[in-house]
Curated annotation (Swiss-Prot):
<protein>
    <recommendedName>
        <fullName>UPF0434 protein swp_2279</fullName>
    </recommendedName>
</protein>
<dbReference type="GO" id="GO:0005829">
    <property type="term" value="C:cytosol"/>
</dbReference>
<dbReference type="InterPro" id="IPR005651">
    <property type="entry name" value="Trm112-like"/>
</dbReference>
<dbReference type="Pfam" id="PF03966">
    <property type="entry name" value="Trm112p"/>
</dbReference>
<comment type="similarity">
    <text>Belongs to the UPF0434 family.</text>
</comment>
Length: 57
């Protein structure tokens, strides 16, 4: 199942409440402010802080 980009208008980073960006290559939602990535499983974003991965610098 593909990620629906319309969700970007309504989802926010659970840590800072900021906007998220979609990374199609890695299938993740990125918070540039907190420098973390949230996985997307079967088209569903997993917006749990304990599931987020730090971004590579």
């Amino acid at each position: 199942m593909a990620f629906d980009k319309k969700l970007l208008d309504i989802v926010a980073c659970p840590v800072c409440k900021g906007k998220l960006e979609y990374n199609k290559q890695d299938n993740q939602l990125i918070c540039k402010f907190d420098k973390i990535a949230y996985p997307i499983n079967d088209g569903i974003p997993v917006l749990l802080e304990n599931k987020a991965e730090p971004l590579a610098e």
